[in-house]
UniProtKB/Swiss-Prot annotation:
[2Fe-2S] cluster binds at residues 108, 110, 126, 129. It comes from Trichodesmium erythraeum (strain IMS101). Disulfide bonds join 113-128. The keyword Transmembrane helix applies. The gene is petC. The 4 large subunits of the cytochrome b6-f complex are cytochrome b6, subunit IV (17 kDa polypeptide, PetD), cytochrome f and the Rieske protein, while the 4 small subunits are PetG, PetL, PetM and PetN. The complex functions as a dimer. It is an enzyme of class 7 (translocase). It is a single-pass membrane protein. InterPro entries: Cyt_b6_f_Rieske, Rieske_2Fe-2S, Rieske_2Fe-2S_sf, Rieske_Fe-S_prot, Rieske_Fe-S_prot_C. This is Cytochrome b6-f complex iron-sulfur subunit.
Length: 179
């Protein structure tokens, strides 16, 4: 066949060169995939900036709309929601149409069971080993060594937003153990 004028001969890639390139690409991809979690471990998490919170979700995974939530719940109730890191978190209703400024992580500090609210006794009682917490989540009976973790509960655009609690624990007067 005749070549068109002005087009140089382009040598085709040999089989060995193609296999070397394919092997190099595969090894590189596997190495990068294996290194990603290691590198990601050493990168500190973002501080979250001004919007570092998580919108609370109900049992169906829908955002909690505060006006609707308060209309359907009574004063003194503690209702589970999905909070920071997906942990079950209690939304505390303090007064008429008022949410507490804090939420309670519902994971027991003993062995990680979800602690249900016992309204008749006005406390949280762990079903696994009997730890008890008062209505603010402060441990009152072991074997749990620590109080339930706190989160800030704020309202933004009529949605409930949980943010990390880093201040002094108002129940104990000490630095929070969960930070």
């Amino acid at each position: 066949m005749a070549q068109a004028e002005g087009t140089p001969d382009v040598p085709s890639m040999g089989r060995r060169q193609f296999m070397n390139l394919l092997t190099f690409g595969t090894v590189t991809g596997v190495a990068l995939g294996a290194l990603y979690p290691v590198v990601n471990y050493f990168i500190p998490p973002s501080s979250g900036g001004s919007g570092g919170g998580v919108t609370a979700k109900d049992a169906l995974g829908n955002d909690i709309i505060v006006s609707e939530f308060l209309a359907n719940h009574n004063s003194g109730e503690r209702t589970l929601a999905q909070g920071l890191k997906g942990d079950p978190t209690y939304v505390v209703i303090e007064g008429e149409q008022t949410l507490a400024e804090y939420g309670l992580n519902a994971v027991c500090t003993h062995l990680g069971c979800v602690v249900p609210w016992n309204g008749s006794e006005n406390k949280f009682i762990c079903p696994c080993h009997g730890s008890q917490y008062d209505n603010t989540g402060k441990v009152v009976r072991g074997p749990a060594p620590l109080s339930l973790a706190l989160v800030h509960a704020n309202v933004s655009d009529d949605k409930l937003v949980f943010t990390q609690w880093e201040e002094t624990d108002f129940r104990t007067g000490e630095k929070p153990w969960w930070v």
